[in-house]
Amino acid sequence: MSLVYLLIAILVIMAMILLMSKRRALAKYAGYIALVAPVISSIYFLIQIPSVAKLQYLSTSIPWIKTLDINLDLRLDGLSLMFSLIISLIGIAVFFYATQYLSSRKDNLPRFYFYLTLFMFSMIGIVLSDNTILMYIFWELTSVSSFLLISYWYNNGDSQFGAIQSFMITVFGGLALLVGFIMLYIMTGTNNITEILGQADHIKNHGLFIPMIFMFLLGAFTKSAQFPFHIWLPRAMAAPTPVSAYLHSATMVKAGIFLLLRFTPLLGLSNMYVYIVTFVGLITMLFGSITALKQWDLKGILAYSTISQLGMIMAMVGIGGGYAQHQQDAIASIYVFVLFGALFHLMNHAIFKCALFMGVGILDHEAGSRDIRILSGMRQLFPKMNLVMTIAALSMAGVPFLNGFLSKEMFLDALTQTGQLSQFSLISMIAIVFVGVIASVFTFTYALYMVKEVFWTKYDSKVFTKKNIHEPWLFSLPSLILMVLVPVIFFVPNIFGKGIIVLALRAVSGGNHQIDQLAPHVSQWHGFNIPLLLTIIIILLGSVLAIKVDWKKVFTGKIRQISVSKSYEMVYRHFEKFATKRFKRVMQDRLNQYIIMTLGIFMIIIGYGYIRIGLPKVHQLHVSEFGALEIILAIVTVTIGISLIFIRQRLTMVILNGVIGFVVTLFFIAMKAPDLALTQLVVETITTILFIVSFSRLPNVPRSNANKKREIIKISVSLLMALIVVSLIFITQQTDGLSSISDFYLKADKLTGGKNIVNAILGDFRALDTLFEGLVLIITGLGIYTLLNYQDRRGQDERE
């Protein structure tokens, strides 16, 4: 089955979900219909593993906009396969979990599952895209669907603010990424990603190479919540927990990492890229791990822990990026080891973090709180979640016999080997190891502290008063399955390592198939070495800090108020107030004022152009022949126009304005343009009648006395606008050096297959204009239909 058919199948499921929104009886089954999408995609991608392992990559290319090299290019290699499996398999767990989390009585289920399926469709589109512009479209679709999901409970102020904040930051990064893609097109002449990576040696010597890297980093850092763009992720926790488990831990936040991995053969050619990604990742890891200890909300803790873990993966992606420069060197195996560790921990993090979010969601759903100051001794009430969250948290902390231990060991090993790499000095290595170890200590601390406070403290019935707590099996099933995978991966890591991660490494290395020999064999025991010593130190220090320190009392007062997010909110509120004041000053419900402002800005732009190039010179002016009729019509038009300034009765003004329109109709007839005359006549008649009918239903309020200052402004704007129009006519008559667009239409008319030049212009040459005009009519019709339908429902409700 083609990759396109898979995407079409997901779109069909989305359409079915939308249809269910019309039938309340069917709406409650929307989740199970939506569940088909990740199941189908999971089966599809699992079947493709043997083919990808044999280097039989699946690709599809459908021409779209050939002149701009924008095509529907899709490609399934090892990297896209790994990410697609994570998106699809985690999707099954999350979609099923959501069917138990949401209520068909309180929630609009079709709307939620449509948004969630749209997000899954967009993420799969990102990882399969082999065209930069296509990737950008899917990239922004994830931002849009994330916005819709975060704001799903739109009556909640936190949901609204979180959705807006995440949308603004991620779209800003997306626009920067688009600029980077355009730079790549300028440098290579193609938008095809495979072809771009094949020109890496040419691109690195181009003047736009470094600016392009910065654009890519902005896109990746904003999407993957790297410092200082991390602030949107904690606010996004206002979304329903299934959204947090899927988007904000396992998939969307990994899109930035995917971007850098996909372009590693190109970006890694710059040492600057290696430095920036490595140190930004480590700073983010340290910042996230410390800030997590400040949180009282369990989802807040997990949000900052996600930021920290993403920083850890990003640091490994940065260090491993140097492989692009040293593929044939003896140290190539170190880079491959680091990249393998990044991919391994990316997979591990998706599993244990999704399980943690699901556990928090069950606690919130059943206990009614996520506050660790209220939740205590929950192991008695939630034994299954105690097991799930404890194992998942310890895996995140890097405790032995769990999958997180293996990837954390690889991370520490990678840090200690940076001294052997040409990009890092001994001092850099010491700083990297120090920051990585300190961040890991705090990671262990918040992971252990979280489960200790929620499950292993004494149950206090005075603080937690809710009764009749239960822990449904179906609700717990997805998190239990993910929990089982945590120790399973520890004992059989190479099933995933050799079967999936090595395939992804081939793509990250730029198609170097010899990387199979360089890829590490994951072992549970490497003997007593420096990474193991560091792990022991981390566990001992982290245990002491988690057990002996009451972190709820440490971050209090002014220390707690220090926050990058609060600084963003302060700036945002300031600009919001500033914009509101300006808006109220400008938008005063006066149409003539809006027209004056619009024309004024237009005149400023034209005036600036005249200042730069000089006023148009009048020479060889061609004046059309005119007779007495044209002179009379012109005098009538000018006379009526001047009289409108002094007339105070609105109805008289409307009638005279209509007369001007009819005079223009006579002008068209005199100029032998009957089609334009007929159009003008119909439009002018309808608008005049509508005006008169509207005024007949409005109170007879006389027009206010003229304000001399305002009238002078109006007359001045009108005269200046008239002069500009006349000057533009002069300019167009003197552009003899340029070919006329009308000549092009006449010569190319036969190519369209049309028999009428007007039809050819509307249907071919100006097809987009016609399309958008049609869309305007459709949207207007939908608006009218909605209003009428609303009135019908309202009347029916009143009768009932």
From Swiss-Prot:
Pfam families, per the entry: MbhD, MbhE, Proton_antipo_M, Proton_antipo_N
Keyword Nucleus attached: no
Annotated GO MF terms: antiporter activity
Membrane association type: Multi-pass membrane protein
Transmembrane segment boundaries: 1-21, 33-53, 78-98, 118-138, 167-187, 207-227, 241-261, 273-293, 300-320, 331-351, 387-407, 424-444, 472-492, 527-547, 595-615, 627-647, 651-671, 676-696, 712-732, 768-788
Subcellular location: Cell membrane
Any GO BP: monoatomic ion transport
Tagged with keyword Cytoplasm: no
NCBIfam families: PRK12646.1
Known function: Expression of the mnh2 operon in E.coli is not able to catalyze Na(+)Li(+)/H(+) antiport. It does however confer higher growth rates than the control strain at up to pH 9.5. The operon may encode an NADH-ubiquinone oxidoreductase.
Protein family per UniProt: Belongs to the CPA3 antiporters (TC 2.A.63) subunit A family.
Assembly and oligomerization: May form a heterooligomeric complex that consists of seven subunits: mnhA2, mnhB2, mnhC2, mnhD2, mnhE2, mnhF2 and mnhG2.
Protein name: Putative antiporter subunit mnhA2
Lineage: Bacteria, Bacillati, Bacillota, Bacilli, Bacillales
